[in-house]
């Protein structure tokens, strides 16, 4: 397809239509509770596991605005001067295909306790807590097939909540909803120069694959609970 010539400067004309842009993307989700949670150290993260092949783990944003209006000096309908943002919500739907015991504890909303005495010794028990959510730090890694760069979403605070169970390929899945929480903190020494790039909802990093572990080690020390 030949595009008409134009004086407009299209900066990505050589790459915008490449078939290599169709590369498939895989995701990894890490979560670190900010309150004591048995089995997960304060600076530790739980890997939520593998997801169904058709899972779309991407943020859904809901932004509510309220218009500020004024009388139209020429008559007719009022004119809109500005719009105030009244509320912001960012959520992820996360179906987990391979939940281990730690992930199932997160799905329960509380760590299980081991029964140490009596005929049930060695068993585990956890409370049923409908609607319970766990506050923590959330990292979502996005890797594209055949690409060196990895996109990493960093949310210093999020609520992780059970959203029941589902089904994929005749296998049960545990469903989570992660809701990002606004949270301000002072970045550590590695990121302090880039404080303006980290909003109360976090930041997105783009790093080479060989620097992913360095970034994760850096984020492990960020936004720790007081």
Name each model feature, range by range.
Residues 91-95, 137-140, 177-181:
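Beta-strand secondary-structure signal
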Residues 154-226:
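Mixed-charge, glycine-accented linear interaction segment located at domain edges/termini
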Residues 107-116, 195-203:
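Extended Gly/Ser/Thr-rich low-complexity repeat segments
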């Amino acid at each position: 397809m030949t595009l008409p010539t134009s004086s407009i400067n299209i900066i990505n004309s050589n790459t915008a239509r490449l078939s290599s842009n169709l590369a498939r993307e895989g995701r990894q989700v890490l979560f670190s509770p900010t309150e004591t949670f048995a089995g997960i150290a304060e600076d530790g993260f739980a890997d939520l596991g593998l997801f169904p092949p058709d899972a779309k783990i991407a943020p859904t944003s809901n932004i509510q605005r309220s218009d500020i209006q004024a009388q139209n000096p020429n008559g007719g309908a009022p004119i809109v001067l500005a719009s105030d943002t009244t509320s912001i919500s960012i959520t992820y739907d996360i179906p987990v295909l391979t939940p281990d015991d730690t992930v199932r504890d997160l799905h329960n909303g509380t760590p299980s306790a081991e029964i140490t005495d009596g005929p049930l010794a060695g068993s585990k028990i956890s409370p049923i807590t409908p609607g319970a959510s766990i506050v923590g730090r959330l990292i979502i890694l996005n890797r594209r097939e055949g690409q060196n760069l990895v996109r990493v979403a960093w949310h210093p605070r999020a609520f992780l909540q059970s959203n029941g169970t589902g089904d994929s390929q005749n296998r049960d899945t545990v469903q989570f909803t992660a809701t990002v929480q606004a949270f301000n903190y002072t970045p550590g020494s590695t990121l302090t120069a880039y404080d303006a790039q980290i909003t109360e909802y976090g930041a997105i990093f783009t790093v080479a694959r060989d620097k992913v572990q360095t970034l994760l080690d850096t984020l492990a020390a960020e936004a720790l609970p007081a």
